[in-house]
Curated annotation (Swiss-Prot):
Quaternary organization: Heterotrimer of A, B and C subunits.
Gene3D superfamilies referenced in this protein's UniProt entry, alphabetically: 1.10.10.410, GatB domain, N-terminal subdomain (1.10.150.380)
InterPro entries per UniProt: Asn/Gln-tRNA_amidoTrfase_suB/E, Asn/Gln-tRNA_Trfase_suB/E_cat, Asn/Gln_amidotransferase, Asn/Gln_tRNA_amidoTrase-B-like, GatB, GatB_C_1, GatB_Yqey_C_2, Gln-tRNA_amidoTrfase_suB_CS
Reaction equations catalysed: L-glutamyl-tRNA(Gln) + L-glutamine + ATP + H2O = L-glutaminyl-tRNA(Gln) + L-glutamate + ADP + phosphate + H(+); L-aspartyl-tRNA(Asn) + L-glutamine + ATP + H2O = L-asparaginyl-tRNA(Asn) + L-glutamate + ADP + phosphate + 2 H(+)
SMART domains: GatB_Yqey (SM00845)
Protein name: Aspartyl/glutamyl-tRNA(Asn/Gln) amidotransferase subunit B
Designated gene of the protein: gatB
The organism of origin for this protein: Coxiella burnetii (strain CbuG_Q212) (Coxiella burnetii (strain Q212))
One annotated GO biological process: glutaminyl-tRNAGln biosynthesis via transamidation
EC id: 6.3.5.-
This protein's UniProt keywords: ATP-binding, Ligase, Nucleotide-binding, Protein biosynthesis
């Protein structure tokens, strides 16, 4: 029997606010344990939560970017459960009346086709604390710094049918929240976490199977591997006549497997009820319009503009716009020097610069070569001061911190030889020293032109303009 996976994702995005969702405590990452938790975060008696308006604004911003509806009011509810890192014994979340409803996000599959993934809802909630075990000598500690940090939980429709589609959706969502500035979505810091709901059904059937939930997967690669394992696990059970248990599972990256954590809870297990300490949130059309007017250019809008304005291929555009920082770097280079061809800038950013960054595990914002320096290099390639190979030499030297292109060219004597008289002298010597190859070329072996050009490049230590040399050879021969 052929089985069809049915996958829905719940993504927890930490919102980019200076303070927590219901208190004035800071949200900065990496502080000493329990130095950023106030009485409200700890749920001490007599304290009352106050909603952070910026969190509401960021949630609305996200909703508008995915063409969702923003209801005129939403309600906070208490989600009741016990866990050591939940000091109040309940989590303030949203249940029946979320702040964002019925949106969608288009993803591009590996074959270039586009698929629309529905977004059921996105709701605001507070994060819990975090357990830690190192250095506790048989005990577990609790760090409440994260407690009360604002989260936007984004729930997709069960429209995803493969691990590859799940990763494509997550990458599109990750890019979007960073583009619009609602989150830095740093996965290493837990600012972008994913729960995967997955079931199997016979292909062609509409009824869903029993689902399992895989909690807190924090990398694209692990999401893909967890889904692939879970599909195979459920398939094996069903084909052997067994039944799937509705449960919460954990992905073990070391063993590359999912393991059962607990039986999956239903909504009634959490005993949701409206939080009596928080009034309903009323969101008027004026507020929505104000947020809409501040929306930045969205990823798909930027891709369309790059393709039209810069005449770039879909491949180049996709690489340049995956991260907002790369797109900004590219446009900064072109603004600094309008004589640089966009294709030249794209080739260097997507090629040599990307390779160097990957090799050194750096992001574009950590690049030793800033946009001004790269522009200085590309200017000298565009005006034929440097050949492509010499440009790579300058790039490597620039990466080492020796300054801009002109400084490096002057210091290392890397200026390209374009003087026709000087080049013709070297060409004459090459022709004189290689009579056999000259005869073969004149007999119809046109590919030998590359040999002649190579000899000149060798003689000039790469400083000759290869195109100019090619043309001069053809005239001579």
């Amino acid at each position: 029997m052929e089985w069809e996976p049915v996958i829905g994702l719940e993504v927890h995005v930490q919102l980019r606010t200076q303070s927590k969702i219901f208190s004035g405590a800071a949200t900065a990452y990496g502080a000493e344990p329990n130095t950023q938790a106030c009485a409200i975060d700890l749920g001490l008696p007599g304290v009352l939560p106050v909603l952070n308006k910026e969190a509401v604004k960021l949630a609305v911003c996200f909703g508008l970017s995915v063409n969702a509806s923003i209801p005129p009011y939403s309600i906070f509810a208490r989600k009741n459960y016990f866990y050591p890192d939940l000091p109040k014994g309940y989590q303030i979340s949203q249940y029946n009346f979320p702040i964002v409803q019925n949106g969608h996000l288009d993803i591009e599959n590996e074959d270039g086709t586009t698929k629309r993934i529905g977004i059921t809802r996105a709701h605001l909630e507070e994060d819990a604390g975090k357990s830690f075990h190192e250095g506790m000598q048989g005990y577990s500690g609790i760090d409440f710094n994260r407690a009360g940090t604002p989260l936007l939980e984004i729930v997709s429709e069960p429209d995803i049918r493969s691990a590859q589609e799940a990763v494509a959706y997550l990458k599109a969502l990750h890019s979007l929240v960073r583009y619009i500035g609602v989150s830095d979505a740093n996965m290493q810091e837990g600012a972008f976490r994913c729960d995967v709901n997955i079931s199997l059904r016979p292909k062609g059937e509409e009824k869903f199977g029993t689902r399992a939930e895989i909690k807190n997967v924090n990398s694209f690669r692990f999401v893909e591997r967890a889904i692939l394992f879970e599909i195979n696990r459920q398939k094996e059970i069903l084909e052997n006549g067994g039944t799937i248990v509705q449960e919460t599972r954990l992905y073990d990256a070391v063993q590359d497997e999912t393991r059962s954590m607990r039986t999956k809870e239903e909504a009634h297990d959490y005993r949701y009820f409206p939080d009596p300490d928080l009034l309903p949130v009323e969101i008027g059309p004026e507020f929505i319009e104000a947020v809409k007017n501040q929306l930045p250019e969205l990823p798909w809008e930027k891709r369309k503009r790059f393709a039209a304005s810069y005449q770039l291929s879909n491949y180049d555009v996709k690489l340049l716009t995956t991260q907002i920082e790369i797109a900004n770097y590219f446009e900064t280079v072109l603004k600094i020097d309008k004589t640089i061809p966009p294709k030249l800038a794209a080739n260097w950013i997507n090629g040599d610069l990307a390779a160097a960054l990957n090799k050194n595990n750096l992001s574009i914002t950590q690049s030793p070569i800033n946009a001004e320096q790269l522009a200085s290099l590309l200017h000298r390639i565009a005006d034929n001061t440097l050949s492509g190979s010499m440009g790579k030499q300058v790039f490597e030297t620039m990466w080492g911190g020796e300054g801009d292109a002109d400084t490096i060219i002057e210091r290392h004597g890397l200026k390209q030889i374009t003087d026709t008289e000087a080049l013709e002298k070297i060409i004459d010597e090459v022709i004189e020293n290689n009579p056999t190859q000259v005869e073969q070329y004149r007999s119809g072996k046109d590919k030998l032109i590359a040999f002649f050009v190579g000899q000149v490049m060798k003689a000039t230590k790469g400083k000759a303009n290869p195109q100019q040399v090619n043309e001069l050879f053809k005239k001579k021969l």
